[in-house]
Amino acid sequence: MILLVSPIDVEEAKEAIAGGADIIDVKNPKEGSLGANFPWMIKAIREVTPKDLLVSATVGDVPYKPGTISLAAVGAAISGADYIKVGLYGVKNYYQAVELMKNVVRAVKDIDENKIVVAAGYADAYRVGAVEPLIVPKIARDAGCDVAMLDTAIKDGKTLFDFQSKEILAEFVDEAHSYGLKCALAGSIKKEHIPILKEIGTDIVGVRGAACKGGDRNNGRIDRELVKELKELCK
């Protein structure tokens, strides 16, 4: 299982890299769970990240606006992101989600067919009226994405496991794999959750708070020693 760590700036990215993160995921918590950062920040982080490490970027907790989000995804891709993550926040059903993600996939793959597109749902979707989380693997498959992901929409201390059981998450992972997709899981993940995620076959575990001093995703800063501890648990 590989470790994705989400810095907000270059200094945090350097700490994540020093700690052994496998994917450097550029985000902006001020704009939400999958809040988008600026193109110049993606570019700057790509420049300090070793070539053998992949950079990911979120394009936001997005509304149902396929044109707008396709354009945002292209911005992330040309700024240097290898993974482009889209949070299915404002889409209400399977059909809207597939339409949105199909257009993102087309836009991104036109830039570079090796770019990786991630459809991200929310384990607590009912709290924000987002698309049902357990159909995300099917959405990802039918839209031509590469990765199906779950996160949490509201960052209030509740974790992925407060909304989905280990058994349900295992089914999510297995379904994604059956479609030939990778599976990423995140959502206020704590150290003690990592062995469980590894056991159920998760490909990528995403963290921010667990890698920050004080466990605070908003006010804490990523610390290389915390990243090292998380990385060891992923091996």
Swiss-Prot record:
It holds the Pfam family 4HFCP_synth. Changing residue 155 to R: Almost no change in activity. It comes from the Archaea. It is an enzyme of class 4 (lyase). One of its GO terms (biological process) is methanofuran biosynthetic process. InterPro entries: 4HFCP_synth, 4HFCP_synth_arc, RibuloseP-bd_barrel. Homohexamer. Trimer of dimers. Belongs to the MfnB family. This is (5-formylfuran-3-yl)methyl phosphate synthase. It comes from Methanocaldococcus jannaschii (strain ATCC 43067 / DSM 2661 / JAL-1 / JCM 10045 / NBRC 100440). The gene is mfnB.
